Structures are given as structure tokens and as C-alpha cells.
């Protein structure tokens, strides 16, 4: 490949931009402290995990199925399902994983309705359109968790006997976890048997947090889920967006399609799949021991609590959900939100303490600006109130402005 001087200059400019902003991220859940230099040499190959997975190979030779199998073995254990009872693959990201879970639910219950909270990731709107699933948005509790009463009220009103439940294991804006045990208990109380509904878990961020904490909320197959997806570029960290999805093998069998010229069965959403991301996930998972993952997660959680404490000590109403690295606080000015690349929604903003925040310098800088702005706004409000009070206490003017000017 030969590039013109102008094109080389453009690339160099982008390189400098990336180097400058490599660790900028405080508002979005993407870990930046990764090093895949050992894998650079593989970029000269067209590695394509075509149709197959680590469970079944295709006849395309340059694949990374062996590594993908190791990755899926790791996640089967992480999410408490026997490898022989599980099926999964490395996806392009959380949206594909969620689509796969909803696809399985729809194939199991073609006339079922998908129920999800209003705090669910925006991709669910695309998914229901693409899969043409009936759907109902459910109210959320103040912390972002699904409103269980509203969920059951809607299921009852719809007379839905085969609900497909989209549970959040860490919502996008508030890091809230829907309690999948409570959901199952409420469905049982409503007379809906376990085999009559499907339960998918979107654990894009928290799927790599909960397994490593001392007191996790329910999140695994042992807790009753039918499928789960996790993003690879969030807590793990990757230069290429990716993720994984794990499901029960018996539910996946119904979507299998044999492709003779590839000599494989297709069960994935996409056909050709990135063969480099399984290598990256494999390298990342092999690079840290269980104890090291626990340390990374604890550091992130401790940093999140530090941010909450600093905000609250300065009178800012900040908070986080249990076992969440998402810190929610009142939305600051557009200037601050833009400067720190904050995600904002309505009156709230958040910061996310992913592992690349080795110290609190960026968090401190953000909090200092938010606090200073809040104090200035308070001062202005007091001054405006005082001036208004003075005006109201002045005696009414008894002269005509036109004649006395």
C-alpha cells in the first residue's frame, strides 16, 4: 500500500489526535489500558470466523476458532452454565448480543411480547423493528431499575402467556440492575410457568463486574437467565468494538441453518465474523488471573465511591447503584459536558470509572468544575432573589413615567 504525502499527513494527524486523547474517556464505559502489541503481526492476515464457532468449524482455514472456544469456555464458567449446555460466540458488540438473545426468544415464542424498561439501551428499539417483535416499554424506578409492579400490570393487561423479558444487568445511564430473581418470582405468582417465558440479560458493562465482587446481585444462568451478552470493549478493553453472547444450547438449535459450501451450520447473526477480536478477548482474559480481575474491579468501584463522596461533600446530589461504576449527578452546563465528553440524559449526567483511571486526577478536575459552577449558580440565584425582594418591598411609583421623564 502506497499513500500520497497528503494522505500520510492526514493519517499522522489522526495518530497524534489518538495519542493525545487515549485516556480522555470519563463519560463512556470503555477501558483504554490495554496492550495487544503481541497480536500486531496477525493484522497481515484476513482472519475470518466464517459461520462456525469454537463449537463447529467451517472449511475456511484462516480462522481463530480455537481461541474463540477458549473465550466461550471462560464465559460459560463465569456465568455458571456447563460448557456442554451452552452455546455462544464473539459478537461485534452489545447490540448484536441483545439481538441474538431477542431472536432466540422470538423463535421460542413467535407471538410473545418483549418487555423492557424505559432505561433499556436504545438499541432495543432497532431490534424490535428488525425482528418484528411485539413490545411494551415498562416504567423504571427512580434508580433506573425496572418497575416490577408496572411490568406485571402490563403483562396482565396484555394477557401475555409467553412474555420475553429483556433484563438490564447495568443500565446505560444509571447502572441499574433489574432483579431477575424478583422478576421470576412475580411471574410465578402470576401463574406463568418457567418454561413459558424467555429471560435475556443485557450485561454489557456489569457482566465483567458482578462475577468478581463479594456480594453480586443475581446475573447468571444459575439465577435463571436464558441468555446473556457482554461487551468486550468496555470493562475488558479493545481497540475494536466487540462482545460475547452465551445462551442455552437447546434454544440455539432451533435457529441452526446448514450451509453446504462452507460445511458448517450457521447460528450467528452475521456470516463473516471478525477473527481478530476473539484473539484480543483471548489475550485479555489470559493476561489477568482471577485475583487480578478482582483487583481491577475493586479499584474501579472504589474510584466510583470516591467520586460520589467528593460530590456529596460539596453539596452535589451524586449517587450510584450497588456494584456499579456509574456515578450519576445533576447535568452540568453544555460547556462542561462537552469538555469532558459526558453522556447526558434529561437532567442527569454520569461519569464511569473504568480501569484506565489509575488515579483520580481527571475525576477531580471534573468534580472541581461541576462544584465551582454549582456554587456560582447558587450565588447568582441568591443575588437575583435578593434583588427581587428589594424591588417588591419598594413603594409603588405614584408618578406617570411619560410625564415625569
From Swiss-Prot:
Its cofactor is pyridoxal 5'-phosphate. Keywords: Decarboxylase, Lyase, Pyridoxal phosphate. Pathway: Siderophore biosynthesis; pseudomonine biosynthesis. The keyword Lyase applies. Gene3D superfamilies: Type I PLP-dependent aspartate aminotransferase-like (Major domain). It catalyses: L-histidine + H(+) = histamine + CO2. GO terms for biological process: carboxylic acid metabolic process. This is Histidine decarboxylase. It comes from Pseudomonas fluorescens.
